């Protein structure tokens, strides 16, 4: 490790080693390094010598890089929309953002962090991963990067709490999702005299009617690389809160009830009514496991329709409009609210959100994080569709069509709102849930074994 040569410096080598290790791991700015060194008791000259010994620059180039790296899961039309968000930032600042998309974000981030070549910024699909990375000291606290007064006026406290760890803000919630939406083609429903279901039993009855006509009522796909299974987890979470209510949901998330509890088993079984329904999904179960969630969303809107209903969050609208550019909202595509299972919890929804985190500390990162947090930046994607802003100052009128506006209104008016269960559980439990659901889709008779396996993981993870 780097050593100081000034005999007057009375700083422990352990403290210096920790600072150097943190610098090499996190890549914070020269200024931050100097400030932290001097806080340890080093003189300015000794701090500068130490910085040079670790490969730090003596000029401000590293503080103001003209190119930033950003890692995300967004590909296809989602990445196109994000590039549209970033374009004005590059025009205004001259800072280019190199975007890398991967379905295996967890694995790639782990490798990059170990190799000390982490991206400048990452966009994580859930706050659970943010909590894990913050605990590992792999993230930069945002309190000194953003105007906290502005952030507090733009974001509800609940979102800021979710983005915090040990009292510091580590994440800006950027793209939210209302996960209480079931997608369908109104024209097909009208021509076939199908009524949108209000209750779960109504939906099962409709599904059986469609299947009885030799058609497939549902499309479903859970393939997503190393995250395969998450769309099924969204199903289960949405069912659970509608079936057992918010208090039991919180106990489930906190592992105050075991995965073998009847409430959890019931939620899996209700999901199984769709996934394993007779003549419900073409080619099931193999097709469910092999089909990507984006491709599965197209079914109700193909001609002729390959299916009649598809469940996933309101970001599905972006998939539909990108694939079928001539379709008109409300006339050709729409959603109905997730059907009521228990009248006591009518209207309950789950939500998700993608979060912006900083993995290096420099002025360019600071500028991009500040920009992405603004209503103006988020409104760009809002107007393109398939995006729900977390910044509360984006007006509903900015949403491009009545379907998107209805989803936002549904989200703000929902009597019960819970964050997607897997997304706020420990990451190893989330992974166990995903893989367990894949096994359940393939082998429904193995449900008890699946739940016992997830419980074994949870028993260790929550200690």
Per-segment meaning from a language model:
Residues 127-180, 204, 210, 231, ...:
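Hinge/lid segment of periplasmic solute-binding proteins
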Residues 207-208, 253-288:
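Glycine-centered hinge/linker elements that transmit conformational signals in sensory
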Residues 87-88, 92, 315, 322-388:
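Extracytoplasmic/periplasmic substrate-recognition and gating elements
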Residues 133-137, 159-196, 222-252, 350-356, ...:
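Periplasmic solute-binding protein
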Residues 1-32, 41-49:
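N-terminal secretory signal peptides
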Residues 85-155, 162-164, 187-198, 299-301, ...:
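Extracytoplasmic "Venus flytrap"/periplasmic binding protein-like
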Residues 8, 12, 18-21, 190, ...:
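Conserved C-terminal helix/tail region of periplasmic/extracytoplasmic solute-binding proteins
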Residues 111-112, 119-120, 151-187, 217, ...:
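A structural signal for short loop-to-beta-strand junctions that line the ligand-binding cleft
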